[in-house]
């Protein structure tokens, strides 16, 4: 029987309880289930040992190596620097080379890392501390165990007085008070990595240094970031602590009902009879009329006279005040009321700038120009409604017999600005056909133009004014025989329009003299210098008489002194001012007034410039076909190329597209040139394909589109090319095909597009390397075929 101890005799048996064990025995494991089968025996795969006679001989015993200070040490090999450097380079290359990890591998690595961190944190929390609690503050089950009676007994870990009580959690004075002292918070989870802290700190320092260096570079090039938190849109509450609030509203004020100062207002008149200080003119007029009526009522005879005088004085005062007022625009004022401020605003409106002494103010309309009545009637008949900026500024200066340099954009109406003062000048001279000797002394005025087409165009424009006035105009250009031109000069001519080369030939052949020439005009002077006409121009100007040359003193700026004597007057018009043009101006012009419209070399604001980066002839031809067939632009259309050989090829391509086309270049005869321009002007031809020969001065009306199939060699030529459209205040479009071969002009082209208010710079041009800085043109060489004259230098 359990729990009973016998002493050996059957009758005497003493029953005693067994002593309680110190600990409960462990619970035995449950028996295996009955249906579980026994595991099978292991397979007999072991090989039996070989018999003694078949066993291999035993190896000889190894000699016991000597250990200690007397043992032979292996020879030490020195470290190879090259090997260390090679290993370091391989390690750096392997570390720098990116390693591709698939998405599944990245997820697996992340899960393993997270599991390790969780396991490390769990182990850290489960480790018991010295006071018998784990890291979270709870008691460890290995320290406190429950006895069979249900009480808790623990191994003594402190004084006897504290064994059966709670563990103290504070000072003795605070133990019996109800203070809730929570256990300390658990430590933050620690992350374990394979690398030590020194490597991490070093890598972190390198990353911080690289980030600081990148921030400095960004601040240098991008500027400091604006860290202001101010926002104008942010609503702010107004504080009312300093605002005094009354206990009543303003509508409750009844002081005006019984106060006589508010009921009977006194009308005070001071600062002159009838004037109330601080009031406007309308109130002053009312008071003046009231005072005049009072005078008439008092005295019918003398009072009415005095009243009329007062009203007249008020009217003159009002006119005098309106003369100096600032609220009216210059277009609403009379000429005598214009002040210096009004003229400054007027010049800014038309982008006019003048230099020189005693320069007169520009004209606001044709009626204020000072031209004779007969010329004003012709101007109205021709159809000039409003003067252009160059006409507003140049005509008043030229009418004062001043020398003039006009710097204006192409297509700005320069022809009329020098023709009208010229006609006024020669209309005061004797008729050239009055005596025979006057016919033989040459013309009164000469007009020099760089190309034949421009000279003929000036002749057509001049005949609109000279035929009604009875003056004779003759053009002398190449392409015509000398006999034909001599026949045109048989009756004399007041005005001769010529190219410099042919005019020099006529002077050397004694077909023409300049004995009485007193008016010289050079149109497109910079173009004449580009074509090599500097020497012919100097010969022509040296052939002029010196008896009527102006003095190079301050009298040349005095209009009264210049008009008292018929001095020679010289005018020069140009789009740019190269050094050769300045040299001619200093030599032959006397104290000239300089008029600049806009900026030198700029295109007019009426031309929309489009630039397309297209490389290759085939792609450009395809793009040209798309533009012409789009129907956006109506003929006439001008296509510019750089080389004469390309003109005919492009013209053939355009004809295959279904459009009529003609060519214009230096190899054409004069008759072919005139026929080509006439066909474009009368509308029988849609497209004109030309070189820079047609880039200047060719006035084809209503050109809607200019296509630069090849970009011009200089920005000046480009300016005059696109100036063929958008003339006389009309709008136009210029499309340019650009390639890498045009790197020399990309910077200037980008600057011109940025200045134009209606044009846009394409991103390809904006980011191109050649468009970032101005190139060095010291060694730039222009093509010989670009001028359109071949080896003739444009003289004929």
From Swiss-Prot:
Binding site for ATP: 408-415
Helicase ATP-binding domain boundaries: 395-595
Source domain of life: Eukaryota
Polar residues bias: start-end ranges: 1-12, 127-148, 786-796
One annotated GO biological process: mRNA processing
Chain ranges for the short sequence motif Q motif as given in the UniProt record: 364-392
EC number annotated for this UniProt entry: 3.6.4.13
Domain Helicase C-terminal residues, every copy: 606-769
Key words of the record: ATP-binding, Cytoplasm, Helicase, Hydrolase, mRNA processing, mRNA splicing, Nucleotide-binding, Nucleus
Gene Ontology molecular functions: ATP binding; ATP hydrolysis activity; nucleic acid binding; RNA helicase activity
Entry note about domains: The Q motif is unique to and characteristic of the DEAD box family of RNA helicases and controls ATP binding and hydrolysis.
Family, as annotated: Belongs to the DEAD box helicase family. DDX23/PRP28 subfamily.
Quaternary assembly: Component of the U5 snRNP complex.
Protein task: ATP-dependent RNA helicase involved in mRNA splicing. May destabilize the U1/5'-splice site duplex to permit an effective competition for the 5'-splice site by the U6 snRNA, resulting in the switch between U1 and U6 at the 5'-splice site. May also act to unwind the U4/U6 base-pairing interaction in the U4/U6/U5 snRNP, facilitating the first covalent step of splicing.
This protein's name: Pre-mRNA-splicing ATP-dependent RNA helicase prp28
Biological source species: Neosartorya fischeri (strain ATCC 1020 / DSM 3700 / CBS 544.65 / FGSC A1164 / JCM 1740 / NRRL 181 / WB 181) (Aspergillus fischerianus)
Chain's gene name: prp28
